[in-house]
């Protein structure tokens, strides 16, 4: 090494004079890139999570709605079947009650006619036997006495029905028939929904075949006249 180099005056070196702009900018650029990439990645993941939540919530809402609609549809179907089944029973009951009410009215007419005929016979007997035929009070007392001795009511009333109506009649009308002393009987020859009432020596046949025969006889009798 030469003496000139050693003898050369040393220049003062200051570390602050180093130009670090390029490195700092480069480093800052890298850090900014990393932050941006992280931010983009976080946003994408957040969007995916939101999308998954939307799908999940949509699926749950759809499942609940479908379950509710399915339940309502099933309930409506079951209720319609129940209503249809019970409507058939109600229709049978209404038909039975209508026929029974009509038959009882006819039966009452027969009983009333029988009572009137009995009253006429009693009146005739009283008029023939009493010495006081013109005494109204005596006449009424004798009729009252005779009426007290004889009970004008249904004697052992019986209702004959088809075996097909056995369960229906027993279930809905068994108690009331039993309460009023009616006996329910079954006959295979009686069509379903029709019946025969008997009491003492009075019989009321409300079957369609009997009504048809009576109608034919009535028409035949009118044609003969």
Swiss-Prot record:
Coiled-coil positions? none
Cellular component per GO?
bacterial-type flagellum; cytosol
GO BP terms: namely:
bacterial-type flagellum organization; bacterial-type flagellum-dependent cell motility; protein transport
* UniProt keywords, alphabetically: Bacterial flagellum biogenesis, Bacterial flagellum protein export, Cytoplasm, Protein transport, Transport
GO terms, molecular function: cytoskeletal motor activity
Q: Which Pfam families match?
A: FliH (PF02108)
PANTHER family associated with the record: FLAGELLAR ASSEMBLY PROTEIN FLIH, YOP PROTEINS TRANSLOCATION PROTEIN L
Recorded protein name is: Flagellar assembly protein FliH
The gene name reads fliH
């Amino acid at each position: 090494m030469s003496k000139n180099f050693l003898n050369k005056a040393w220049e003062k070196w200051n570390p602050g004079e180093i130009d670090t702009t390029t490195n700092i900018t480069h480093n800052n650029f890298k850090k900014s890139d990393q932050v941006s990439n992280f931010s983009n990645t976080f946003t994408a993941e957040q969007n995916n999570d939101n999308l998954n939540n939307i799908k999940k919530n949509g699926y749950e809402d759809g499942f609940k709605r479908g379950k509710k609609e399915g339940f309502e549809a099933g309930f409506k179907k079951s209720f319609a079947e129940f209503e249809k089944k019970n409507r058939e029973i109600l229709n049978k009951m209404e038909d039975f009650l209508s026929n029974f009410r009509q038959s009882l009215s006819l039966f009452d007419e027969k009983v009333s006619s029988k009572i009137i005929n009995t009253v006429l016979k009693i009146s005739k007997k009283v008029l023939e036997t009493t010495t006081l035929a013109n005494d109204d009070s005596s006449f009424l007392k004798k009729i009252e006495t005779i009426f007290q001795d004889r009970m004008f009511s249904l004697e052992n009333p019986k209702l004959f029905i088809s075996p097909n109506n056995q369960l229906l009649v027993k279930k809905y009308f068994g108690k009331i028939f039993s309460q009023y002393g009616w006996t329910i009987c079954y006959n295979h020859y009686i069509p379903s929904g029709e019946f025969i009432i008997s009491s003492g020596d009075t019989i009321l046949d409300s079957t369609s075949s009997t009504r048809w025969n009576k109608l034919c006889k009535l028409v035949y009798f009118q044609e003969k006249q």
